Amino acid sequence: DANLDHNIERMLEAYAAQTWHTSGYVPKDIEYPKQRQVNKLPVIDHVMQHAALNPVEDDIRNTIYYHCPAGSKGKGTHYFYNLIKRDIFNSPQQDTFYCLPIDIHHYFQCIDHNLLKSEYRRKIKDRKLLSFIDELVDSFNPGIVLGVKLAQLLGQLFLARFDYLALRCFDIIDDPEKFHYWQARYVSDMLVTCRTQQQTQLLCEGVSFLNERFEKFCRHGLHHY
């Protein structure tokens, strides 16, 4: 606080001149809830990253699927818990009978720098901000650093387009050959896997009904989302 004005002026000058360099990382091992290694930075680096991110953060977060609340203001673990609870209580029991937790093993360590840079360039056009983010990304290898807000946001953005593609069944409806192949598989597999009264009722609606149902999945995503 004693040198606040001086530090702010120094940070602004470094940002404007594109001469800012991320400080050295201090690794820290975390054991709970899962074993991983995060990296600590001095306070000045966090202030710099938050300030640089501020003008574009809302726009980037609006790109990310809303079921990814980590690091978002007003969201977090309880927000995600309430989303899951809502789905369970508002959906038929047979539709929520199973829960499959999926995790990308060592996700942050596997992110390719060039692919990540091309991804955030879809949303950010300011040259100085791009230079600042590029420097942060390249300051850690392999992958991107775990333990700073900006890196967490970039990690979510990196998967954003994949999330929406998954919800739309990977846009197979835009490829007639692929769409009709999987539509036929959907109907035929329903015949083989029929186990419940509800599935029997769906089959009794006929092939045309099942074809239309599959098309709705592809156009609008699964109804839970």
Sequence positions of predicted segments:
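Charge-rich, low-complexity amphipathic helices
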Residues: 74-78, 176, 212
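Conserved polymerase palm-domain catalytic core
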Residues: 82, 87-210, 219-225
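Conserved two-metal-ion catalytic palm core of "right-hand" nucleic acid polymerases
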Residues: 1-116, 138
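Inter-domain linker/hinge segments that demarcate the starts of reverse transcriptase
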Residues: 7-19, 200-216
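Generic preference for hydrophobic/aromatic residues in regular secondary structure cores
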Residues: 20-27, 38, 183, 212, ...
